[in-house]
Amino acid sequence: MRLVIARCSVDYIGRLKAHLPSAVRLLLVKADGSVSIHADGRAYKPLNWMSPPCVIAEEEGVWRVTNKAEEQLVISIEQILHDSTHELGVDPGLRKDGVEAHLQVLLADRPDAVREGLTLVRREYETGIGPVDLLCRDADGSTVAVEIKRKGEIDGVEQLTRYLSRLDDDPALPHPVRGILCAQSITPQARLLAADRGIACSVVDYDALRGLEPSIPTLF
């Protein structure tokens, strides 16, 4: 991971245009290729970001970050106050709480509860940056990656986006790979971002799933 603290301005050029005026900010460049711009506020949320895969071109005083859709972040750097790179190694990942772990078990037995026609290929399919909860196939034989959360939020969409970018490069899988964020509830912000990323959303009833026998069909 590369950490850069710099006085900079930022322009987003894509479907919309956005501008961050000059200020001191933290630039995070992660090993997965993502770039995010942070202020000393907003908790963990960046002011702007570019999800992987993307290409970073560093010129004198300017970074140009371009993704597959040809959207760009143009970071104009006036002064660098700190620049360091750290090797963090492979992260073991976040352990799911009891509900999320149990949901994964239940939905592995009943993938049709996520979306009609899904069949399970494998649980915990490794992507190289962490395992996606369920790898499935739909009725047409297409690959579907399902990420399971107790509550679906923006972080879950970002996580699934990173997994999908890796799965799209997996030669063992039929392409393209679609994504579904599955949770007991999903926030409006997460739904909006998911729709923008081409990710479907599925809400499941944990209590109902716990009471279902595998032989009993259900509609959600």
From Swiss-Prot:
<keyword id="KW-0238">DNA-binding</keyword>
<dbReference type="InterPro" id="IPR002793">
    <property type="entry name" value="Endonuclease_NucS"/>
</dbReference>
<dbReference type="GO" id="GO:0003677">
    <property type="term" value="F:DNA binding"/>
</dbReference>
<keyword id="KW-0255">Endonuclease</keyword>
<dbReference type="GO" id="GO:0005737">
    <property type="term" value="C:cytoplasm"/>
</dbReference>
<dbReference type="InterPro" id="IPR048302">
    <property type="entry name" value="NucS_N"/>
</dbReference>
<dbReference type="GO" id="GO:0000014">
    <property type="term" value="F:single-stranded DNA endodeoxyribonuclease activity"/>
</dbReference>
<dbReference type="InterPro" id="IPR011856">
    <property type="entry name" value="tRNA_endonuc-like_dom_sf"/>
</dbReference>
<comment type="function">
    <text>Cleaves both 3' and 5' ssDNA extremities of branched DNA structures.</text>
</comment>
<keyword id="KW-0540">Nuclease</keyword>
<dbReference type="Pfam" id="PF01939">
    <property type="entry name" value="NucS_C"/>
</dbReference>
<keyword id="KW-0378">Hydrolase</keyword>
<dbReference type="InterPro" id="IPR048301">
    <property type="entry name" value="NucS_C"/>
</dbReference>
<dbReference type="Pfam" id="PF21003">
    <property type="entry name" value="NucS_N"/>
</dbReference>
<comment type="similarity">
    <text>Belongs to the NucS endonuclease family.</text>
</comment>
<dbReference type="InterPro" id="IPR049173">
    <property type="entry name" value="NucS_N_sf"/>
</dbReference>
<protein>
    <recommendedName>
        <fullName>Endonuclease NucS</fullName>
        <ecNumber>3.1.-.-</ecNumber>
    </recommendedName>
</protein>
<keyword id="KW-0963">Cytoplasm</keyword>
